[in-house]
């Protein structure tokens, strides 16, 4: 499973990239708005840092306007992926983008059949949301597993991005259940690196080393 970072913060992206694990970036209008910067300029800046796919989301809800926006986003850099909501209009736009050779990430996927529809429309990626399903008493990981099984049965090449990741257990279970990618906030990436036994082990090694230097 590959790791994307879910942010529009350049410093967070650079820090994750330095770890050698970063395969791509996902953004959304809320994340960019939080940065208080021009949307297109920030996407261009991110594409200059990361070689992998960078998802940039359209704002419009009508297919023709989504297509217009997406074409402009795709001009920013060759690694831009146009992020489209899972709606009827979104599916129309995905089909048009597929015909144009523009890669897409269908977001706000909450059922396996939505993922299948998006894949058949030509989506490059689908993004099932884990945390938001968990919030309403559903098991988001069941969705990842269902989508992975359906795609495997029908030999579908669309990649599954586990989104709305809240903690390290989400990441582990997404990998076990067939997600190709997990897109993760910076704070969760930081948590993945840490384990209390690792810290204890380092402390013990250092303490033992200091004892040898005292002799």
Curated annotation (Swiss-Prot):
A biological-process GO annotation: pentose-phosphate shunt
Keyword Transmembrane helix: no
Subcellular location: Cytoplasm
Cysteine pairs bridged by disulfides in the record: none
Pfam families noted in UniProt: TAL_FSA
Reaction equations catalysed: D-sedoheptulose 7-phosphate + D-glyceraldehyde 3-phosphate = D-erythrose 4-phosphate + beta-D-fructose 6-phosphate
Active-site residues (renumbered): 83 (schiff-base intermediate with substrate)
InterPro entries in alphabetical order: Aldolase_TIM, TAL/FSA, Transaldolase_3B, Transaldolase_3B/F6P_aldolase, Transaldolase_AS, TSA/FSA_arc/bac
UniProt main location, coarse: cytoplasm
GO molecular function: aldehyde-lyase activity; transaldolase activity
Keyword vocabulary terms for this entry: Cytoplasm, Pentose shunt, Schiff base, Transferase
Enzyme Commission identifier(s): 2.2.1.2
Pathways involved: Carbohydrate degradation; pentose phosphate pathway; D-glyceraldehyde 3-phosphate and beta-D-fructose 6-phosphate from D-ribose 5-phosphate and D-xylulose 5-phosphate (non-oxidative stage): step 2/3
Top-level enzyme category: transferase
CDD domains linked: Transaldolase_FSA (cd00956)
Physiological role: Transaldolase is important for the balance of metabolites in the pentose-phosphate pathway.
Protein family (similarity comment): Belongs to the transaldolase family. Type 3B subfamily.
HAMAP family (UniProt xref): Transaldolase_3b
Name assigned to this protein: Probable transaldolase
Gene giving rise to this polypeptide: tal
